[in-house]
Amino acid sequence: MTSIAHERFHAVAEEPAYARENAPAVSRSAPAAISLTGLEKSFGGNRVLRGINLHIPAGQFVAVIGKSGCGKSTLLRILMGLDEPSAGELHFEDADGAQASPNARIVFQEPRLLPWLSVADNVVVGLGDGVDSRAAAKAAEAVLAEVQLGEKTEEWPARLSGGQRQRVALARALISRPGVLALDEPLGALDALTRISMQELINRVWRELGFTAVLVTHDVSEAVHLADRVIVLDEGRIALDLPIPHPRPRRHGHPGLCELEGRLLAAILGTDGGH
């Protein structure tokens, strides 16, 4: 039977986590490196992931793109401990290369806010149990200010726009200051201008906090704008692993970025042979 080196770590599916440098409730988690070797996933007779070999250095921002059904979200769920691989190995490593169990959080396309809780109380959910209530409230206030919702702490989720609700979901993920943050199509339901604003926010908090980030998206432009590296999946295999060498901040429409987008689209459509 194939060994699955995958220690269960603290990943709250509904709530991500982060907070400001001076927030008293938690300390910043060290980013973790991620290594996949021969990773497979099947549902019945359907092989969704086929021999995935991938190393993500600590602190890197990686985007995963591809056609619907290529295995993107399945890969992310396995990374976050929400699903088990059928075969292969998954390791998280600390700065010394030793196996680690990182503080990891995930943000979904649907914010999944609790309607009976205020914005601040929704964010506090991301801390889990055992945190002093005053410290938790202070941390929530700080992280909401960081995502530019400092004036919405006592608001109800139903009164927020779609973009504001997604900012709350991001704050909930960030309040625990994760070492790994997964983003599963987090901007897919937002309008174009709100998406750009959220991209800038995600880029900023990633640069400030230094966590390892894995983004799943259908948007090639979004992937190129945010990631250090873009992985194209095709029928469960890695078809292209493309570095994005451009300095940050990146301007939408930059000719060099447009060229990279073209290469990625060709790989998705299968018109470049994966090269």
From Swiss-Prot:
It catalyses: ATP + H2O + aliphatic sulfonate-[sulfonate-binding protein]Side 1 = ADP + phosphate + aliphatic sulfonateSide 2 + [sulfonate-binding protein]Side 1. The keyword ATP-binding applies. PROSITE patterns: ABC_TRANSPORTER_1, ABC_TRANSPORTER_2, SSUB. GO terms for molecular function: ATP binding; ATP hydrolysis activity. ATP binds at G66, K67, S68, G69, C70, G71, K72, S73. One of its GO terms (cellular component) is plasma membrane. Pfam families: ABC_tran. It comes from the Bacteria. It is a peripheral membrane protein. Its main location: membrane. Residues 34-260 form the ABC transporter domain. Part of the ABC transporter complex SsuABC involved in aliphatic sulfonates import. Responsible for energy coupling to the transport system. Belongs to the ABC transporter superfamily. Aliphatic sulfonates importer (TC 3.A.1.17.2) family. PANTHER family: ALIPHATIC SULFONATES IMPORT ATP-BINDING PROTEIN SSUB, TAURINE IMPORT ATP-BINDING PROTEIN-RELATED. This is Aliphatic sulfonates import ATP-binding protein SsuB 1. It comes from Rhizobium johnstonii (strain DSM 114642 / LMG 32736 / 3841) (Rhizobium leguminosarum bv. viciae). The gene is ssuB1.
